[in-house]
């Protein structure tokens, strides 16, 4: 291995070329497989620049294959080629002074778009690269932030347990903190326009439509009264032990995940014509869409962040009630939902049972049973067939006359609460504050 490659990165790679596993399927052309093998040979004979160049060639070629058909139809073989390309490109960048952050980004995109190779080698290299350049990233953060946000405590000065998420996120949601108490008592005048905080109205809930709340039910009680009959319920006290409820702050997320690349939704809701997605670092997302409210709506939504960043996964747990399903723990899909006040998930349904755990901020949620489907006017298209055409909080009664006849339940989900959404139940979600939620899809 060439000495220009950081020793910590070299330590993660196989010791010899013979131990470097290249496993590709029959669909991959011989010349492409030979390119992968030549890049590996370059790596082990110290031709790092050539190795990186071949990696870039593999990325470009396999990218065309990944985009030639529907993503679900793309075989693992070409995604593996993409991952090998990212690996070789990243190693090449590691040998260039000042390119560690770019190497991190290349590895992350390999994780997001490619397939796992060599026992999660890309993930292990990312962990190494994060350790190599933490001080550089912290210096960059301070430069972007300028003067430290008042009230946003330095993680170096306080241990995670010394402040709750309410305090840690207060400076971002506004210095005038939302007063505690019943949700219906929330005063929107407490928001300060000058602080660029949206003054979002909080719905006043009707007791007849409120989703019931239950404190730490037994597995049997939850199964018999909610899972089997398929009824929504807000669970309380079941995630109080999760470290994230005390540890997570904007600064903590930046420190642990700031340099990582993630997909961000741009636009108020995915049904809008101007909606789009873009890859960016968590730091860029926070700077543009959390700390600065003038760039429109950005939402880190429905992303398997915890598979990408194991450090964050250590702060949560899979709810015990998931054991009542037939699937194994590995088959449970865990998604992160992180965004400013005002993000909206249009009325839609999911094909699995759903536990939505609220970590930071509050969300207004309305749910409709499957029996109400005809009154909810789903899109006719195959892509959006699980999504309603109706704007739930501002429906067009002339266009959707039966919508007002649909029965629903609703809640305001607060930190520490978990909402059970039965399979295929329709649900609409709007963030009332800066919010971080974790969903668990299980069968």
UniProtKB/Swiss-Prot annotation:
Membrane spanning stretches: none
Reaction equation(s) it catalyzes: N(6),N(6)-dimethyl-L-lysyl(36)-[histone H3] + 2 2-oxoglutarate + 2 O2 = L-lysyl(36)-[histone H3] + 2 formaldehyde + 2 succinate + 2 CO2
Disordered, as annotated region: 139-174
PROSITE patterns, alphabetized: JMJC
A GO term from the CC aspect: nucleus
Gene Ontology biological process terms from the UniProt entry: circadian regulation of gene expression; G2/M transition of mitotic cell cycle; positive regulation of DNA-templated transcription
GO molecular function: chromatin binding; histone H3K36 demethylase activity; histone H3K36me/H3K36me2 demethylase activity; metal ion binding
Role noted for this protein: Histone demethylase required for G2/M phase cell cycle progression. Specifically demethylates dimethylated 'Lys-36' (H3K36me2) of histone H3, an epigenetic repressive mark, thereby acting as a transcription activator. May play a role in the regulation of the circadian clock.
Limits of the JmjC domain: 298-443
Required co-factors: Fe(2+)
A Pfam family recorded for this sequence: Cupin_8
Binding-site positions, Fe cation: 348, 350, 427
Species of origin: Xenopus tropicalis
InterPro entries, alphabetized: ARM_KDM8_N, Cupin_8, JmjC_dom
Residue stretches of biased makeup (Basic and acidic residues): 139-165
Gene3D superfamilies in the cross-refs: Cupin (2.60.120.650)
Key words, A-Z: Biological rhythms, Cell cycle, Chromatin regulator, Dioxygenase, Iron, Metal-binding, Nucleus, Oxidoreductase, Transcription, Transcription regulation
Name of protein: Lysine-specific demethylase 8
SUPFAM superfamilies assigned: Clavaminate synthase-like
Localization, UniProt: Nucleus
Cofactor note: Binds 1 Fe(2+) ion per subunit.
EC number: 1.14.11.27
């Amino acid at each position: 291995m060439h000495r220009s490659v950081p020793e910590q990165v070299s330590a993660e790679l196989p010791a010899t070329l013979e131990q470097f596993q290249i496993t590709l399927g029959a669909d991959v052309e011989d010349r492409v497989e030979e390119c992968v093998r030549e890049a590996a040979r370059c790596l082990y004979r110290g031709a790092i620049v050539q190795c990186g160049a071949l990696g870039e060639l593999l990325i470009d070629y396999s990218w065309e294959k990944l985009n030639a058909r529907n993503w679900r139809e793309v075989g693992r073989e070409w995604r593996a080629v993409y991952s090998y390309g990212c690996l070789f490109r990243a190693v090449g960048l590691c040998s260039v002074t000042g390119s560690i952050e770019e190497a991190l980004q290349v590895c992350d995109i390999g994780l997001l778009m490619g397939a796992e190779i060599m026992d999660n080698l890309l993930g292990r290299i990312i962990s190494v690269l994060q350790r190599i350049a933490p001080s550089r990233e912290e210096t960059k953060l301070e430069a972007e932030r300028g003067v430290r946000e008042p009230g946003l405590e330095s993680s170096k000065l306080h241990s995670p347990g010394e402040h709750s998420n309410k305090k840690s996120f207060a400076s971002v949601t506004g210095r005038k903190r939302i007063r505690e108490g019943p949700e219906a008592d929330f005063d929107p005048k407490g928001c300060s326009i000058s602080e660029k905080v949206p003054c979002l109205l909080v719905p006043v809930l009707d007791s007849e439509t409120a989703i019931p709340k239950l404190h730490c039910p037994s597995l049997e009680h939850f199964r018999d009264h909610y899972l089997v009959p398929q009824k929504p319920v807000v669970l309380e006290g079941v995630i109080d032990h999760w470290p994230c409820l005390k540890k997570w702050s904007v600064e903590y997320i930046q420190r642990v995940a700031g340099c990582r690349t993630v997909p961000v939704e741009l636009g108020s809701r995915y049904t809008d014509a101007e909606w789009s997605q873009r890859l960016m670092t968590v730091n860029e997302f926070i700077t543009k869409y959390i700390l600065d409210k003038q760039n429109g709506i950005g939402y880190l939504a429905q992303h398997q962040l915890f598979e990408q960043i194991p450090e964050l996964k250590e702060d949560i747990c899979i709810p015990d009630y998931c054991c009542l399903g037939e699937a194994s723990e590995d088959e449970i899909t865990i998604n992160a939902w992180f965004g400013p006040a005002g993000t909206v998930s249009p009325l839609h349904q999911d094909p699995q049972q759903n536990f939505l755990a609220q970590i930071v901020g509050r969300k207004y949620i309305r749910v409709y049973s499957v029996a109400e489907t005809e009154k909810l006017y789903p899109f006719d298209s195959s892509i959006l067939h699980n999504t309603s055409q109706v704007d739930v909080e501002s429906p067009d009664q002339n266009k959707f006359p039966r919508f007002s006849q649909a029965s629903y339940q609703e809640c305001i989900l607060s930190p520490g609460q978990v909402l059970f959404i039965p399979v295929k139940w329709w649900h609409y979600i709007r963030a009332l504050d800066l919010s971080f939620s974790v969903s668990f899809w299980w069968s």
